[in-house]
């Protein structure tokens, strides 16, 4: 066979291969519904990029009882990134009381006002205290009995690198009506987290739904205006994050019907940063179902 025939054969084979490549399905649903989900996704991207979003987390440091000095110098109890002052100050933890004292010559701001000595409120109080110097922002988180510093850098390089999150094609078939089955009394369920610990949470009931002729059930957690669902499925660890995804719903209607719209299921913050403390799905919320809706994995971690 001469060279020209070999080249033609190769080109033909490549053409056939590309032609046989499975095309991703088009969005399915009314134009209004598709636009609604696209708008939700765009707002999700914008929230991630905000100063309060998950993309700019650059540190998580657990505090010990007593004094905890921090800054970029190795001499501190806690070493901040190199773009911070050598010593920013000290956080004193005494029982559950936290106090910040700044180092000399360092401008630390709270609500744009310079502070040198301040009592700190953690994130679970609803009135957390945020401190700032330069492009760094930090506040106290409480997880169980532990207190830690969560650090952000509003000029973190990832903010420039981050563009979007892949999602499955929008498909209104994944907008499913579920029946809310109350627990009386509410059931205590175990919620593991990425730190390796487990906490109990109240589940007011389960959400029962049918897909492809099979029945499935998810334990719900009460949220401000409805339910919060942490779930994993047969895409987890393959096309989506291995530790599951999150989904919020509205409250049940008068017939105890709740809409589960898996097109707005999304990645937990641990996908984007190792400094988040994500809850994981309770074992009963691992579904033997491939949910091809919502956000796919971001980055290389599964």
Regions found by a protein language model. Give the residues of each.
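Extended, aromatic/histidine-rich regions of cofactor-dependent oxidoreductases associated
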Residues: 161-167, 236-238, 257-259, 263-302
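C-terminal motif of bacterial Sec signal peptides marking the signal peptidase cleavage site
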Residues: 16-19
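N-terminal beta-hairpin/loop module of FHA
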Residues: 32, 36-84, 234-235
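Surface-exposed beta-loop interaction hotspot
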Residues: 132-199
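Flexible, glycine-rich surface segments
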Residues: 177-236, 241
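Forkhead-associated
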Residues: 63-128
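Bacterial signal peptide processing site
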Residues: 21-23
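Bacterial N-terminal signal peptides that target proteins for export
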Residues: 1-8
